Amino acid sequence: MASKQLSREELDEKAKQGETVVPGGTGGHSLEAQEHLAEGRSKGGQTRKEQLGHEGYQEIGHKGGEARKEQLGHEGYQEMGHKGGEARKEQLGHEGYQEMGHKGGEARKEQLGHEGYKEMGRKGGLSTMEKSGGERAEEEGIEIDESKFTNK
Protein backbone atom coordinates (compact mmCIF):
# COMPACT_ATOMS: atom_id res chain seq x y z
CA MET A 1 0.00 0.00 0.00
CA ALA A 2 1.63 3.25 -1.17
CA SER A 3 -0.52 5.63 0.88
CA LYS A 4 0.07 6.60 4.50
CA GLN A 5 -3.15 4.88 5.53
CA LEU A 6 -2.67 1.69 7.47
CA SER A 7 -4.32 -1.51 6.30
CA ARG A 8 -7.06 -3.11 8.37
CA GLU A 9 -4.59 -5.83 9.38
CA GLU A 10 -2.10 -3.24 10.68
CA LEU A 11 -4.84 -1.38 12.54
CA ASP A 12 -6.10 -4.65 14.04
CA GLU A 13 -2.57 -5.47 15.23
CA LYS A 14 -2.24 -2.04 16.89
CA ALA A 15 -5.65 -2.50 18.55
CA LYS A 16 -4.57 -5.89 19.90
CA GLN A 17 -1.54 -4.16 21.46
CA GLY A 18 -3.90 -1.84 23.34
CA GLU A 19 -3.78 1.20 21.05
CA THR A 20 -7.00 3.03 20.20
CA VAL A 21 -7.20 3.07 16.39
CA VAL A 22 -10.85 4.13 16.00
CA PRO A 23 -12.06 7.42 17.54
CA GLY A 24 -14.54 6.38 20.24
CA GLY A 25 -13.27 2.80 20.27
CA THR A 26 -11.23 3.04 23.47
CA GLY A 27 -11.15 -0.28 25.30
CA GLY A 28 -11.73 -2.48 22.26
CA HIS A 29 -9.12 -5.23 21.86
CA SER A 30 -9.45 -5.53 18.08
CA LEU A 31 -10.26 -3.24 15.18
CA GLU A 32 -13.74 -4.73 14.85
CA ALA A 33 -14.41 -4.39 18.60
CA GLN A 34 -13.34 -0.73 18.50
CA GLU A 35 -15.61 -0.07 15.51
CA HIS A 36 -18.57 -1.61 17.35
CA LEU A 37 -17.81 0.34 20.55
CA ALA A 38 -17.54 3.60 18.63
CA GLU A 39 -20.83 2.98 16.83
CA GLY A 40 -22.62 2.10 20.07
CA ARG A 41 -21.25 5.14 21.86
CA SER A 42 -22.27 7.38 18.98
CA LYS A 43 -25.83 5.99 18.95
CA GLY A 44 -26.02 6.33 22.73
CA GLY A 45 -24.93 9.95 22.47
CA GLN A 46 -27.54 10.67 19.80
CA THR A 47 -30.27 9.12 21.96
CA ARG A 48 -29.21 11.18 24.97
CA LYS A 49 -29.10 14.33 22.84
CA GLU A 50 -32.67 13.68 21.67
CA GLN A 51 -33.79 13.18 25.29
CA LEU A 52 -32.15 16.35 26.63
CA GLY A 53 -32.51 18.64 23.63
CA HIS A 54 -29.68 20.67 22.14
CA GLU A 55 -29.14 23.07 25.06
CA GLY A 56 -29.34 20.35 27.71
CA TYR A 57 -26.85 18.20 25.83
CA GLN A 58 -24.46 21.13 25.47
CA GLU A 59 -24.75 21.85 29.19
CA ILE A 60 -23.91 18.23 30.07
CA GLY A 61 -20.81 18.46 27.84
CA HIS A 62 -19.78 21.73 29.43
CA LYS A 63 -20.10 20.27 32.94
CA GLY A 64 -18.09 17.21 31.88
CA GLY A 65 -15.36 19.44 30.47
CA GLU A 66 -15.22 21.48 33.66
CA ALA A 67 -14.97 18.32 35.79
CA ARG A 68 -12.15 16.99 33.59
CA LYS A 69 -10.36 20.34 33.80
CA GLU A 70 -10.55 20.16 37.59
CA GLN A 71 -9.15 16.61 37.60
CA LEU A 72 -6.21 17.40 35.33
CA GLY A 73 -5.37 20.90 36.51
CA HIS A 74 -4.72 23.80 34.15
CA GLU A 75 -1.52 22.45 32.54
CA GLY A 76 -2.88 18.93 32.14
CA TYR A 77 -6.06 20.23 30.54
CA GLN A 78 -4.08 22.38 28.11
CA GLU A 79 -1.86 19.42 27.24
CA MET A 80 -4.93 17.28 26.58
CA GLY A 81 -6.30 19.95 24.23
CA HIS A 82 -2.96 20.25 22.46
CA LYS A 83 -2.77 16.47 21.93
CA GLY A 84 -6.34 16.46 20.62
CA GLY A 85 -5.52 19.24 18.17
CA GLU A 86 -2.42 17.40 16.98
CA ALA A 87 -4.41 14.19 16.51
CA ARG A 88 -7.07 16.04 14.51
CA LYS A 89 -4.38 17.70 12.39
CA GLU A 90 -2.91 14.28 11.64
CA GLN A 91 -6.33 12.90 10.66
CA LEU A 92 -7.18 15.79 8.32
CA GLY A 93 -3.75 16.54 6.91
CA HIS A 94 -2.33 20.05 6.61
CA GLU A 95 -4.84 21.38 4.04
CA GLY A 96 -7.85 19.86 5.79
CA TYR A 97 -6.77 21.28 9.12
CA GLN A 98 -6.30 24.74 7.62
CA GLU A 99 -9.72 24.50 5.96
CA MET A 100 -11.29 23.55 9.30
CA GLY A 101 -9.72 26.61 10.92
CA HIS A 102 -10.91 28.83 8.10
CA LYS A 103 -14.48 27.52 8.42
CA GLY A 104 -14.35 28.07 12.19
CA GLY A 105 -13.21 31.65 11.67
CA GLU A 106 -16.00 32.27 9.18
CA ALA A 107 -18.58 30.81 11.57
CA ARG A 108 -17.28 32.99 14.41
CA LYS A 109 -17.39 36.06 12.16
CA GLU A 110 -21.02 35.27 11.38
CA GLN A 111 -21.84 34.88 15.10
CA LEU A 112 -20.19 38.14 16.17
CA GLY A 113 -20.96 40.28 13.16
CA HIS A 114 -18.44 42.52 11.41
CA GLU A 115 -17.83 44.92 14.32
CA GLY A 116 -17.39 42.22 16.96
CA TYR A 117 -15.05 40.20 14.77
CA LYS A 118 -12.99 43.29 13.97
CA GLU A 119 -12.75 44.20 17.68
CA MET A 120 -11.67 40.66 18.56
CA GLY A 121 -8.97 40.88 15.89
CA ARG A 122 -7.68 44.13 17.40
CA LYS A 123 -7.33 42.45 20.78
CA GLY A 124 -5.71 39.33 19.31
CA GLY A 125 -3.26 41.45 17.35
CA LEU A 126 -1.92 42.92 20.59
CA SER A 127 -1.05 39.55 22.13
CA THR A 128 2.54 38.38 22.47
CA MET A 129 4.14 35.18 23.77
CA GLU A 130 4.46 36.86 27.19
CA LYS A 131 1.15 38.74 27.47
CA SER A 132 -2.42 38.40 26.33
CA GLY A 133 -4.02 41.01 24.11
CA GLY A 134 -6.13 42.15 27.06
CA GLU A 135 -3.07 42.69 29.25
CA ARG A 136 -1.28 44.66 26.53
CA ALA A 137 -4.37 46.77 25.79
CA GLU A 138 -4.68 47.63 29.48
CA GLU A 139 -0.98 48.51 29.81
CA GLU A 140 -1.00 50.69 26.71
CA GLY A 141 -4.36 52.31 27.39
CA ILE A 142 -6.00 50.86 24.27
CA GLU A 143 -9.77 50.67 24.53
CA ILE A 144 -11.21 47.21 23.65
CA ASP A 145 -15.00 46.97 23.68
CA GLU A 146 -15.62 43.36 24.71
CA SER A 147 -19.39 43.91 24.67
CA LYS A 148 -19.03 43.52 20.89
CA PHE A 149 -17.80 39.93 21.42
CA THR A 150 -21.30 38.62 22.15
CA ASN A 151 -23.21 36.63 19.57
CA LYS A 152 -25.72 38.50 17.45
Curated annotation (Swiss-Prot):
It comes from the Eukaryota. InterPro entries: LEA_5, Sm_Hydphi_plant_seed_CS, Small_hydrophilic_seed_prot. Residues 1-17, 32-63 have a biased composition (Basic and acidic residues). GO terms for cellular component: cytosol. Residues 1-63, 116-152 are annotated as: Disordered. In seeds only. Specifically located to vascular bundles in the cotyledon and axis of the dry seed. Also found in the epiderm and outer layers of the cortex in the embryo axis. Induction: By abscisic acid (ABA). It is thought to provide protection for the cytoplasm during the desiccation stage of embryo development. PANTHER family: EM-LIKE PROTEIN GEA1. Belongs to the small hydrophilic plant seed protein family. This is Em-like protein GEA1. It comes from Arabidopsis thaliana (Mouse-ear cress).
